[in-house]
């Protein structure tokens, strides 16, 4: 019996430009390249009651790169394994025990979340199950850690003052222009400079 976990990472990506509304169009997509580390939260021991230890408490177990791969510090005789599906979800298997998952790197242009650590626990239920899912509240019912990064969005505040009186002038109109062409996530030019 082993623990089974899926990690997915999404965020808004620039898709297009609505010229009538004069606003950018965004959609959620999977984010490839966010990095997570998994640490043993206490000793992770073999299930044969022989006292062999797979990982010591606090030891790094794996580095996960969303949409790409997982690198384990030990394969635990084939228990530690991974696959990546067509939606860029990384599926991993781990020995039973308690773990901490930490996001250590997000993609350029995305806000690194303050909530970047999650607890996992895979506990033995019976000898019939091939795998068990996380028993903490940090994953959904299917054992998936579904995470989202917010796109960093600049905010601009403009205030027009009278040059002589320094009083605020209401109703002033401003234009915001781009010095470079703007492209969407697929590399298509959507706004010309």
Residue ranges of model-derived segments:
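Solvent-exposed loop/turn and edge beta-strand elements of beta-rich ligand-binding domains
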Residues: 1-193
